[in-house]
Amino acid sequence: MRTLLVFLLLAILVAVLIGNVQVEACKEVDECGDMFVCIEGICEPLIG
């Protein structure tokens, strides 16, 4: 039971760290590539 709790806490920590990296991934509009645009720090696909 204790091992499962430690594993879940580590998984949550890794998910938060990955989320922070993705939010800070882009700062310029054209930084994400051809079919994506940077909106509020996140690469979003162009629709339309």
From Swiss-Prot:
Q: What does this protein do?
A: Leech salivary gland peptide with unknown function.
Post-translational modification Isoleucine amide, affected residues: 47
Q: List the disulfide bonds.
A: 26-38, 32-43
| The organism of origin for this protein | Haemadipsa sylvestris
Tissues with expression: Expressed in salivary glands. Highly expressed in the head, body and tail with a 2-3-fold higher expression in the head.
Q: What domain of life?
A: Eukaryota
Q: Which residues form the propeptide?
A: 22-27
UniProt family annotation: Belongs to the annelide toxin family.
Q: From the Swiss-Prot or TrEMBL record, give the protein name.
A: Peptide HSTX-VII
